[in-house]
Amino acid sequence: SSDLMNIGLIAHDSKKKLMQNFCIAYRGILNKHELYATGTTGRLIEEVTNLNVHKYLAGHLGGQQQLASQIEHNDMDMVIYLRDPLHPKKHEPDVNDVVRLCDIYNIPFATNLATAELLIKALDRGDLEWREVYR
């Protein structure tokens, strides 16, 4: 199994249920790693999975900036950001700040379920061991 990785989880309101279902489905993989999430998303994940999640503030109250700061300190190995591409809410932070930082620090980043599943399966196979080089 792969080394301990730090995984960031963010979901817009309309995608929170999807994030819960994703974490239920991949609970056996996620429980081997450190999970970080914006406040409400983290609480909702914990409620349905019993996974331990480090919770930031709510996304619109600065939680997304807290996650971004962890990326800037090269202390994040993967980010799953389930966003609503059709109906973004005014209070929901812009995804682009996180995209930019993940590109700068070469961090695997998913914004939809298909890519998130590929990343989690790769993580479980040990395909992300190269991240160690960047730390």
Regions found by a protein language model. Give the residues of each.
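N-terminal phosphate-binding or glycine-rich loops at protein starts, especially the Walker A/P-loop
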Residues: 5-31
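Short internal beta-strands
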Residues: 32-41
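Short hydrophobic/aromatic-enriched beta-strand-loop microsegments
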Residues: 34, 51-61, 130-133
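Short, acidic/small-residue loops that bind anionic groups at enzyme active sites
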Residues: 36, 99-119
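Mid-chain, well-packed structural core segment of small domains
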Residues: 64-104
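Short, glycine-/small-residue-rich phosphate/pyrophosphate-handling segment
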Residues: 114-135
